[in-house]
Amino acid sequence: MMTLSYIDPIAFELGPISVRWYGIIIAMGILLGYFIAQASVKRIGFHQDTLVDIIFWSAIFGFIIARIYFVIFQWPYYVQHPIEIPMIWQGGIAIHGGLIGGFVTGIIICKQKNINPFQIGDVIAPSMILGQGIGRWGNFMNHEAHGGTVSKSFLENLHIPDFIINNMYIDGKYYQPTFLYESIWDVLGFVILILLRKHLRIGDTFCLYLIWYSIGRFFVEGMRTDSLMLAGDIRIAQLMSIILIIIGVVIMIVRRVKYDAPRYKAVGPLSWPSKEVK
């Protein structure tokens, strides 16, 4: 097995600036997602600048809202440490906040450019879930987003590389590698979406992304020890996962009943709103 001792969250330093693995890995996920989506955009016929605008601005505002979302639910801490609020490189962003910010930004751009949001959502959805799967390794590098304590033998029985086991040893205890579970789930989701997309109607791939990601996140979140809590034992991420599953299912049903959406591979660029009504 591959062996590696403790991984320093800081990849390298440029003078007074510390560059963390967390940021590097997040950036890698975004770039890889862009290149994958680019191939689909070419096939459909969207202009390349459209994809750049949507991914760039959705990523920017997604990160901003993800941080605001996290800070809001950790306000008792940040009100005492306001100087740490912009320190996003230390971790502390909430994916669901990022999804909200990214979705809203993407919809606004689609409206401005007269693009069908469901069609572009189908293009980007596989890239999004792959990027999320890659991004979880940023949590690993930061030694965060893990589950409860376990024994070393438990981790060894998972047959995972030694470097993961070694870096799940935090403050004298071994922890459940929940980042890995979610990463594997997301990568599997990416493969499934890519394989199914050409057979689905426009909008279905995006909805399946919401459903698939949320199912995995719901169960993984139940193992984590750092969940944002709403009240009592209600985990915000689990509540949001349920909401997104419902949204995904409802949109799929409504679009099948009310609209005659073409298949993903059968058409070129569609406008906003598309002429799909039965």
UniProtKB/Swiss-Prot annotation:
Biological or metabolic pathway of the protein: Protein modification; lipoprotein biosynthesis (diacylglyceryl transfer)
This protein's UniProt keywords: Cell membrane, Membrane, Transferase, Transmembrane, Transmembrane helix
EC number: 2.5.1.145
Domain of life: Bacteria
Compartment(s) where it occurs, according to its Swiss-Prot or TrEMBL record: Cell membrane
UniProt keyword Transmembrane helix present: yes
Transmembrane segments: 21-41, 54-74, 88-108, 176-196, 202-222, 234-254
EC primary class: transferase
Principal location listed in the UniProt entry: membrane
Pfam families the UniProt entry points to: LGT (PF01790)
GO molecular function: phosphatidylglycerol-prolipoprotein diacylglyceryl transferase activity
Topology versus the membrane: Multi-pass membrane protein
Binding site for a 1,2-diacyl-sn-glycero-3-phospho-(1'-sn-glycerol): 136
Gene Ontology CC: plasma membrane
Family: Belongs to the Lgt family.
Role this protein plays: Catalyzes the transfer of the diacylglyceryl group from phosphatidylglycerol to the sulfhydryl group of the N-terminal cysteine of a prolipoprotein, the first step in the formation of mature lipoproteins.
Name listed for the protein in its UniProt record: Phosphatidylglycerol--prolipoprotein diacylglyceryl transferase
Annotated organism of origin: Staphylococcus saprophyticus subsp. saprophyticus (strain ATCC 15305 / DSM 20229 / NCIMB 8711 / NCTC 7292 / S-41)
Native organism taxonomy: Bacteria, Bacillati, Bacillota, Bacilli, Bacillales
Gene, per the UniProt record: lgt
